[in-house]
Design a protein with these regions (language model features):
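Surface-exposed, low-hydrophobicity beta-strand/loop segments enriched in small/polar/acidic residues
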Residues: 2-106
Length: 106
């Protein structure tokens, strides 16, 4: 069982592949080390795919890979158990058949 994480924040919405960003002091900034607790995505077609690398580019270790949905306008929601998934460097998100992605992180 994980600990109670009380400082969860929503990322800046991604509409295409890119580094996960947060809002700090009213500005969008690339996130460094973080822990993804859950994700929400909106699909543009069947088989939406999300790959998240522990890096600032798609060259890093893949820590999350999800595929789901059967039609356009489906949503894909996933909650990671325990303390979520830790990214030591940053979180680079690759999206396919998805036009909106938000991660909830600590």
């Amino acid at each position: 069982m994980g600990t109670n994480i009380s400082d969860v924040k929503a990322s800046i919405e991604l509409t295409s592949t890119g580094q996960l960003q947060g809002s700090i002091g009213g500005s969008s900034v690339d996130l460094g080390p973080c822990r993804i607790i859950s994700i929400n995505a909106h699909l543009t077609g069947a088989d939406g795919e999300i790959t998240i690398h522990d890096n600032t580019s798609a060259a890093g270790v893949i820590k999350i890979h999800l595929k789901g949905g059967s039609a356009s306008n489906d949503t894909l929601n996933f909650n990671f158990g325990g303390n979520g998934v830790h990214f030591a460097t940053g979180a680079y998100v690759t999206l396919a058949a998805i036009d909106s992605f938000t991660a909830y992180y600590a």
